[in-house]
């Protein structure tokens, strides 16, 4: 008998709305994941193209990472790296 009460609750407008909303969210995420996959493949192709043109992919990735950083954070990181390298006699 508890099952029939649960079935009635499942047919309520609020439940249908929640289910529809959940389905919509899941489908949006799935579409975005597909787009992300396509973009990742495009980025990989650009790196392969740059390598074919003689560019160092590791250096390009480093530049991309550095450009994303806040200038102050980047300066602090570079300063710490310089300090450590000096301490190890690498500079």
Swiss-Prot record:
Listed InterPro entries: GapR-like, GapR-like_DNA-bd
Cited Pfam families: GapR_DNA-bd
Superkingdom of this protein's organism: Bacteria
GO terms assigned for molecular function: DNA binding
Family assignment from sequence similarity: Belongs to the UPF0335 family.
NCBIfam families membership: PRK13694.1
UniProt protein name: UPF0335 protein BBta_6866
Gene source species: Bradyrhizobium sp. (strain BTAi1 / ATCC BAA-1182)
């Amino acid at each position: 008998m508890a099952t029939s009460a649960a079935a009635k609750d499942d047919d309520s407008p609020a439940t249908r709305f929640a289910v529809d909303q959940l389905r919509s969210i899941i489908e949006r995420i799935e579409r975005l994941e597909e787009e992300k996959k396509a973009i990742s493949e495009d980025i990989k192709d650009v790196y392969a193209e740059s390598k074919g043109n003689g560019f160092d992919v590791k250096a390009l990735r480093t530049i991309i990472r550095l450009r994303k950083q806040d200038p102050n954070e980047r300066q602090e990181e570079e300063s710490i790296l310089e300090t450590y390298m000096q301490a190890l006699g690498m500079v």
